[in-house]
């Protein structure tokens, strides 16, 4: 991982939609595997797809929105302690549940929901996420106390 802390961790299913989006970003990223587990050592923003959808009303406690691999990753206390924000992909066909995995992770992990996009995203989405992440990490760095100020 990048020692500057400007890291992205993502999950992509076999559809590879999220993976293709991350490739277009052109920034350092670690993929949560379909099988097996990983542990991270630096703060990160999580990018994930939304599963499920089509319920009459969204329910944060209903389950099924967040991929099981991401749940396992975040159930590792060390990994969960390093999450700083979330970005979610979804399908507009899900209506109010569009990119709803971001709502779930944001609430349960107490981190900001930074952005959402549809399926593989557009070039505008890629540009917005790239610029937004750069600004987000810049702000994170500005809010960390230095050893000299302690």
Curated annotation (Swiss-Prot):
- Check the record and name the InterPro entries matching this protein: Flavoprotein-like_sf, RNR_Ib_NrdI_bac, RNR_NrdI
Query: A GO molecular function for this record?
Result: FMN binding
Q: Which Pfam families match?
A: Flavodoxin_NdrI
Q: Name one GO biological process term.
A: protein modification process
Function of the molecule: Probably involved in ribonucleotide reductase function.
Q: What family classification does the UniProt entry report for this protein?
A: Belongs to the NrdI family.
Q: Which NCBIfam families match?
A: nrdI (TIGR00333)
**The protein's name in its UniProt record:** Protein NrdI
Q: Which organism is it from?
A: Mycolicibacterium paratuberculosis (strain ATCC BAA-968 / K-10) (Mycobacterium paratuberculosis)
